[in-house]
Swiss-Prot record:
Protein name: Pre-mRNA-splicing factor CWC26
Gene: CWC26
Subcellular location, record wording: Cytoplasm; Nucleus
Pfam family, one: Bud13
One Gene Ontology biological process: mRNA splicing, via spliceosome
Amino acid sequence: MPSDLASYLADHYLTADPKPSKKRKRKHGDSKKIKEGAGLLIQDDDDDAAWTKPSSRDADADELSAAATIAGTSAEFRRATKSSWKTLGGGGSSKTNTDHEAAAADAILASAAAESAAARDAEDDAPVVEGASVAAVKMSDGTHAGLQTAATVAAQLQRRRAEEKAQYERERAERRAARGGGGDSSGEEETVFRDATGRRIDVTLQREQKRKAEAEKQRAAKEALKGEVQIEEARRRREKLEDAALMPLARGKDDEEMNNAMKSEQRWNDPMMQFMSENDKREAGGTAKTGGRRVKGRPVYKGPAAPNRYGIRPGYRWDGVDRGIGFEAERFKALNRRERTKDLEYNWQMDE
């Protein structure tokens, strides 16, 4: 019985101590205790004491504090002022009241969240997400309007270039498919050029003509650097190559062309050369003096050599060193000096 009485009193008459007020200095234990879920007030004997009664200053502070308090007072105070009925039932009413308060709080939170979402939708203050379905304002170069970072602008420009390239490839493929060219690059459209009269200009033909003219100019410049002998030899080689196309594959001893070519070739050690006359040599295709060779066909020195009074050329094995005493050179100097003096004397006589 005592345990049941203690639990009954705790459930129906005892409440937790409220938090102390910062503006009123009271004792930690209030004289009045409000039972949760009931309207009965328990008053101590010392409540009538003067030191426990609040002063006018404390009352004003309480009014200001109540005015500054956010809407909604404690459940204990509302129940204490609205109802003074005493509940005689068990402790199930406390749990029911707590459930009702939790449901009311959840309803308030849900309504506040709904109002906040509606306000965001109405004021359009939702954050902008890159790549979202909301279309952002873009400029002509493909970048978004407004303040952007360098990396964002570079990525937007790269994306714009990729889109333009893909669009160009699609249009190019469509044009090829329309012309029936497939993937052949030769089906590309060419730029048409026209003159002042409207006549079409064949750019390919003009380029070919310019290329040929340039090649002809270069060939003429190379030909100008060659001598007559080189030009003649080149002509003979071309003729020989042209004749080789009609030449039979097998050539024997009766081939006149080959026999004439072998007879016309001159050799310095040919013993028959000294018995041939000038006419025979010319008929054979040679000359009296060809390539620094004498009529007899013996080799001679082809380099420069000092003149002598007999007109004898040095041997073909001479190394170019003059090993004489210099008489021939002094002789020619004396002859030249005498001729020059003679000319000067004649000119002086004419002046007088």
